[in-house]
Amino acid sequence: MIKIFNTLFLLLISNLLTLSNLKSQDNLESIIDQKKRIEFEIDFLNRNNYLSVSKDHIFLLRENESEKNLKWNIKLLDYNFKSINDTTISLDRSYFINKIDEYKGDFHLFFKRNYSNDKKYLIIKYSSQKGNIIYREMNFPLSLEVKKVLYFKNYFVFLSKANNSKNLISIYNIDNNQLNNIYEFMNYDKNVLKINKINSLNFDVIVSEENSNGLKVISRSIYDLNGNSRDKIRIENKDFSVIETRFLENKYAISILSNKRSRESVGVQYNKLDNNIAVSQKVHLFENLNSITTLTNYKKTKRSKFRIGELFYIDSLSIYDNKILFTIESLKSDDNNDGFSNYQYIPFYNTYSGTYDRKINPRFGGYLHNYFMILSFDYDGEIVRTHAKKIDQLQTFEKKIYIEYIFGNDYHLSSYVNKGKIFISKHFNKIAAEDKEYTYDIETFDNETTIKTETNPEGTYHLGNKVFITYGIQNVKKINNDRKRVFFINKIEIID
C-alpha cells in the first residue's frame, strides 16, 4: 500500500512539474512581433514569383501563362504592404528571367532569351517613382552566360562566362549603344570571382589565380567606365591558398584560407593595407579557435589533425563599436539524393506542357548550411571574440548565404527562415554567457492553418533596424476546410 501511494505521489509530482513547464513556456514573452502578412493566391496559370526590395519599396514580379506569351505582373508595395502600383507586361515565352537588381530605387529586370545561342538579352527598367517601363535589348558578339550586372547612370557593366569557361567583362554605353569589352581575362588562366560597384564612376574586379607554387592568390583591380584599370592589390600567403577576400575601406582585407589544391576552409587571414599594399598579416587557423573546435568535439593531440570538411563563404565585413566584424557561413552541395527532391527542379511548372521546364541534376538534394561564425577583430588583426554555431537542417535550393545579423553592444543576433520556421540566436559578448535560442512558426491569418511551407522559393530581407520581411510559398487550409496555395510575405520585427 505504501509502495502504491509513493508511486502515485511521484507520478502526481511529475505531472505537476510537466504542467508547470508547459505553462512557463506558454508564458514566455516572444522576442518577435509578426506585424503584417499579405498573400497572393497561386492559381493554375501562375508559374513563379520573384521578390526584391529597395529602401522604400517591395517589388513583386509574378510570372503567368498566357497562350503564346508570358504575362509578367509587377506589384509595387510599401513596407506596410500597401499597393503603390500594379502593372502587367507581355513577353515572348522564350524570355527567361535571370535576376532582379535595385539601383537608386528603380528595379532592373534582366532577361535572357533562350534559343538565341546565349547572345540576346533584355533589360527592363521599372521606375518606382514614375511607374514607367523602359525596354533595352542587347546582342552580345559571343555566346555568353551573364553572371553579374552592375548598373550606373549611363552604363551597364557585365561579368560573363564564355563557352570555354573564360571570363569577359563588358561595359555597355546606354547613350550610344556601344559595347566595350575587356578581353584581359579571356587570355589568361584567371578566374573572375566577382565585380563590385565602388562609386558612380568605378568598379572593382576580384580575380583568383595560381602563383608559381600552385597556391591560389586573390587580386583586386579598380576600373573606370572607359575600361582603364588602376590600383591593383594582391593578397597571398606562402603556406595556404587564399580562396576568397573581402576589402573594407581600402584599409583592411580579410580572407578565407585553404590548403593547397583544396577548397576546404582551414582558417582566416587578416591584412592591414596602406596605399594598396599589404603591410601586415595575421593568420588564425580554425584548429586554434575554441568556439569551432568545441562544436566539432576536436581534441588536439600530436597525432590528430583538425579538419572541419566545410567550404566557408564570406557573408559580411563591417565595423561596429571600434571592432571589425567578419561573418562567414558554410555551404556545400548535397549530390547524394536518392529519391525525388524539391531541389531537383527550377521551381516553375509549365501548365501547358504538363512538365517542369528545367530539370537540374536528379541527384541534387540542395545546398547544406552546416556552420556559421562571427569573428571580431581589433584593428591590429587580433581576434577579440568568436561565435561559432552548428546549423540544424538548413537546406536550400539556391546557393546563397542565408543568415542575417544584427550587431549590438551586449550581444549579436543571428536569424534565418527555413521551411516555415524562424530561427533566432542571441550570442552574448560576455565570455561565460551561453547563447539563447528561439524558434517560431511563420504566422498565417487567424482563419487559416498552414499545411506545408515549401522551400523553393524562399528568402529574407533585412529592411533596417530589427525589421525583416520573409517570403515563400505555403499550402494553407481555411476555416471552412477549403485549401489554397499562396505566395506570402510576412513582416517581422525583433522586439527584444
Predicted feature descriptions by range:
Residues 41-51, 92-101, 139-151, 188-197, ...:
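Repeated scaffold domains used in trafficking and secretory/extracellular systems
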Residues 233-243, 283-308, 387-404, 433-465:
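Conserved blade-ending motifs and adjacent loop-strand segments that build the rim/top face
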Residues 66-70, 115-120, 162-166, 211-216, ...:
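Short, solvent-exposed loop/turn segments at conserved positions within beta-propeller repeat blades
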Residues 1-31:
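Bacterial Sec-dependent N-terminal signal peptides
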Residues 31-42, 83-89, 132-138, 178-185, ...:
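A short beta-strand motif characteristic of beta-propeller blades
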Residues 73-79, 121-128, 170-174, 217-227, ...:
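Beta-propeller blade signature
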Residues 50-67, 105-116, 153-162, 201-211, ...:
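Short beta-strand elements that form the blades of beta-propeller/WD-repeat-like
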Residues 44-153:
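Post-signal peptide N-terminal segment of secreted/secretory-pathway proteins
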